[in-house]
A protein has these predicted regions:
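Glycine-rich "HGGG/HGxG" loop immediately N-terminal to the catalytic nucleophile
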Residues: 1-7, 72
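C-terminal catalytic-base region of ester-bond hydrolases, centering on the histidine
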Residues: 140-167
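Serine-dependent carboxylesterase/thioesterase catalytic core
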Residues: 10-116
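Active-site nucleophile elbow and catalytic-triad environment of alpha/beta-hydrolase enzymes
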Residues: 115-142
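Soluble non-cytosolic domains of exported or imported proteins
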Residues: 7-10, 120
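Eukaryotic basic, amphipathic alpha-helical target segments in cytosolic regions
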Residues: 24, 49-50, 133, 137, ...
Length: 167
């Protein structure tokens, strides 16, 4: 991936998939381990790309601390840290803007249940990956996901991601 903070996640996953397709040692597939948002991106690759040439198949995915159902809040600030609190308020207000959804990686998996209709309408990554919109019926994603031999999620004792139950 070219950026963990900035960029359009869908382009980054496409870029990574093309790199994987060019690694001949992976022709028989591979197992993958993802940490934090990297786990979501591995799942996106496994769901979106066919398990046929030129794309190598993912056999097993293990993710640690990955926000597969998104995050619904930003990390908190100390009560006395007014700059942090102002930045947090501004970020939360703009997370569903077109610019944020196309340029800020974390905004692309922000899933606020209090603004769920807005999330479904503007999400450029997570709502698609999770097949959440009412008219989403992407059989390819489902079939590719079912083709995994194993999908293991590990997530506990997290103090940054809200909610920590974001499996």
């Amino acid at each position: 991936m070219t950026g963990s903070e900035f960029g359009y996640v869908n382009d980054q996953i496409e870029f990574a998939s093309n790199q994987l397709a060019n690694i001949t040692e992976l022709k028989d597939g591979f197992d993958a381990i993802g940490f934090s948002q990297g786990g979501q991106f591995l799942r996106a690759y496994a769901q979106r790309y066919p398990h046929a040439s030129p794309y190598p198949r993912v056999h097993n995915i293990i993710t640690f601390g990955s926000q597969h159902m998104g995050v619904s809040d930003l990390p908190g600030c100390k009560l006395t840290d007014f700059l942090c609190r102002a930045a947090r308020t501004a970020a939360r207000a703009g997370v569903y803007s077109v610019w944020a959804q196309n340029n800020l990686v974390q905004a692309q998996y922000f899933r606020d249940h209090m603004r769920y209709p807005t999330y479904l309408e503007v999400s450029t990554f997570l709502a698609d990956l999770n097949i959440e919109s009412p008219d989403a019926k992407n059989r390819t994603y489902v079939d590719n996901f079912k083709a995994l031999d194993a999908f293991v999620l590990v997530f506990e004792k997290d103090k940054t991601v809200v909610p920590k139950e974001s499996l």
